[in-house]
């Protein structure tokens, strides 16, 4: 599959099968984000639920939210994903950080639910070289405090790259967490391509085997969204360094094959690549032009 730049267009034609979007800031509001992403050719987006390097939560204006909800219908935007801040760690051996993390997750779920956001994605946690089983236990306890039977939003556990003491780089770890959640019908998985490749799942040469394993261990019905990115580092590197699509070790062809995989093609795809708006516009169009229609 070769990238053909002759067909690159701007804007959103609105008639493409795949639901592709980007990670985008809401610093200027949801309305601005929706308009900009749609103008880039996207049909969904991901945003941080609060300051990704801190704890401050943005106050949303009612007028902005109302306009955003109208635009969602007008643009026919797919599921919107909120990403938890990097400062939380539900698996931390530090009780203070763990308590802070639980409060943030609980508050975020309530806030995102009130906005009609479909998915709340988080990194499961890092046991910081202590006891992995205790770390998994703490993640389960934290999520059980936050997830309710009545909520509509789905909490997603992100697949991780396996660097350091991260939890979530193996399907079995994610399954263990899910099994411990009381209301686990409210829990799913977000697959990050760079993380998957870096953690040792060969999505380039053995995609079908990887997806079969995912289905057997977790269940394909749990997979709700995909972070699109390439990897600056090689296979099984245990490193988390994103690259633009086609400029890393995963490559464009493998990315397209994954997006066309029968059990994945209807999922929302969120670009998490180190590019600005124009780069993302070109990336979205590159993917659309090369995908089967």
Indicate where each model-derived feature is located.
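Active-site acidic/histidine proton-transfer and metal-coordination neighborhood
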Residues: 74, 90-188
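Conserved, mostly hydrophobic/aromatic
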Residues: 37, 83, 101, 112, ...
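Acidic (Asp/Glu)-rich catalytic clusters
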Residues: 36-41, 61-81, 108-116, 146-151, ...
């Amino acid at each position: 599959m070769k990238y053909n730049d002759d067909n690159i267009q701007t804007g959103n034609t609105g008639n493409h099968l795949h639901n592709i979007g980007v990670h985008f800031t809401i610093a200027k509001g949801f309305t601005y984000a929706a308009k900009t992403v749609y103008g880039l050719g996207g049909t969904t987006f991901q945003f941080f639920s609060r300051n990704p390097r801190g704890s401050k939560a943005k106050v949303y204006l009612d007028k902005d939210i109302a306009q955003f909800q109208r635009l969602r219908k007008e643009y026919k935007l797919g599921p919107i994903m909120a990403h938890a801040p990097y400062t939380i760690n539900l698996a931390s051996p530090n009780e203070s950080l763990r308590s802070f993390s639980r409060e943030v997750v609980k508050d975020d779920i309530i806030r995102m639910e009130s906005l009609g956001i479909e998915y709340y994605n988080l990194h499961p946690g890092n046991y910081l070289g202590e006891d992995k089983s205790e770390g998994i236990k703490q993640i389960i306890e934290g999520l059980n405090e936050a997830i309710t039977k009545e909520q509509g939003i789905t909490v997603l556990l992100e697949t991780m790259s396996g660097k350091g003491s991260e939890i979530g780089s193996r399907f079995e770890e994610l399954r263990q967490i899910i099994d411990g959640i009381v209301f686990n019908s409210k829990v799913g998985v977000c697959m990050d391509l760079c993380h998957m490749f870096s953690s040792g799942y060969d999505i380039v040469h053995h995609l079908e085997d990887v997806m079969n394993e995912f289905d057997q261990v977790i269940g394909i019905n749990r997979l709700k969204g995909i972070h699109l990115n390439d990897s600056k580092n090689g296979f099984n590197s245990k490193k988390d360094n994103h690259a633009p699509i086609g400029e890393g070790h995963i490559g464009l062809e493998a990315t397209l094959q994954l997006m066309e995989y029968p059990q994945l093609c209807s999922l929302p795809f969120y670009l998490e690549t180190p590019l600005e708006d124009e780069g993302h516009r070109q990336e979205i169009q590159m993917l659309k032009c090369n995908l089967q229609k």
